[in-house]
Curated annotation (Swiss-Prot):
<dbReference type="InterPro" id="IPR034332">
    <property type="entry name" value="Upp_B"/>
</dbReference>
<dbReference type="InterPro" id="IPR000836">
    <property type="entry name" value="PRibTrfase_dom"/>
</dbReference>
<feature type="binding site">
    <location>
        <begin position="197"/>
        <end position="199"/>
    </location>
    <ligand>
        <name>uracil</name>
    </ligand>
</feature>
<dbReference type="GO" id="GO:0044206">
    <property type="term" value="P:UMP salvage"/>
</dbReference>
<dbReference type="Pfam" id="PF14681">
    <property type="entry name" value="UPRTase"/>
</dbReference>
<keyword id="KW-0328">Glycosyltransferase</keyword>
<comment type="function">
    <text>Catalyzes the conversion of uracil and 5-phospho-alpha-D-ribose 1-diphosphate (PRPP) to UMP and diphosphate.</text>
</comment>
<keyword id="KW-0021">Allosteric enzyme</keyword>
<dbReference type="GO" id="GO:0000287">
    <property type="term" value="F:magnesium ion binding"/>
</dbReference>
<keyword id="KW-0342">GTP-binding</keyword>
<feature type="binding site">
    <location>
        <position position="198"/>
    </location>
    <ligand>
        <name>5-phospho-alpha-D-ribose 1-diphosphate</name>
    </ligand>
</feature>
<dbReference type="GO" id="GO:0005525">
    <property type="term" value="F:GTP binding"/>
</dbReference>
<dbReference type="InterPro" id="IPR050054">
    <property type="entry name" value="UPRTase/APRTase"/>
</dbReference>
<feature type="binding site">
    <location>
        <position position="77"/>
    </location>
    <ligand>
        <name>5-phospho-alpha-D-ribose 1-diphosphate</name>
    </ligand>
</feature>
<keyword id="KW-0547">Nucleotide-binding</keyword>
<keyword id="KW-0460">Magnesium</keyword>
<dbReference type="InterPro" id="IPR005765">
    <property type="entry name" value="Ura_phspho_trans"/>
</dbReference>
Length: 207
């Protein structure tokens, strides 16, 4: 399925601010949410609409309203940082959760939490995580939401690299990938270069 890099001057500017080592957790979180909000327009381009009859101050007409439920699935913990920005434009979205952690020695992904929501099989499901590095977490999370019954799934991140993109496309060819930036490479520890550092630590100020 397609990989889309959403390029826009506002996104590029805010992402540059996030990359800087000296950026505070507060500013990092704010820019993360603002970028997520800016990406919404492209991510939800094909949401289903239904006609509704309405009355304006001067006439009756036909309008259109979204008739497809949306479920956001943050990969804990860093994915939580993207929710507010998306929910500002999609306030009716329900939230499911997938908790994963990576063994820093083996780079293997382990699940520690998962909580679904109703009607996920009928919903437009967006899995969110700031980083798409090796692709292990993204693939594991999408495995889980598909086990829940999700049929229409997209993956949204800020920064992605080719190994993660390729792995996700190979394991889940039906899932569209959206990123604010395609970065250069992974280092020997599996971190994105130039990247953002550890997004979870920077969001929550834990380092």
């Amino acid at each position: 399925m397609a990989f889309t890099e959403i390029k826009h001057p506002l996104i590029i500017d805010k992402l540059t601010r996030m990359r800087k080592t000296e950026t505070s957790s507060k500013d990092f979180r704010e820019n993360l949410n603002e970028i997520a909000q800016l990406m919404v327009y492209e991510i939800f381009r094909d949401l289903k609409l239904e006609p509704v009859e309405i009355t304006t101050p001067v006439a009756k007409t036909t309008g259109y309203t979204i008739n497809q439920p949306v479920v956001l699935v943050p990969i804990l913990r860093a994915g939580i940082g993207m929710l507010d920005g998306i929910q500002k434009l999609i306030p009716t979205a329900r939230i499911a959760h997938v908790g994963l952690y990576r063994d820093e020695t083996t780079l293997e992904i382990h699940q520690y939490f998962a909580k679904t929501t109703k009607d996920i099989d009928k919903s437009y499901v967006i899995v969110v995580d700031p980083m798409l590095a090796t692709g292990g977490s993204a693939c594991k999370a999408i495995d889980i939401v598909k086990q829940w019954g999700a049929k229409e799934v997209k993956f949204v991140c800020l920064v992605a690299v080719e190994p993660g993109i390729k792995r996700l496309q190979e394991q889940h060819p039906d899932v569209e990938i959206y990123a604010a930036s395609k970065d250069e490479k992974l280092n020997e520890k599996g971190y994105i270069i130039p990247g953002l550092g550890d997004a979870g630590d920077r969001i929550f100020g834990t380092k």
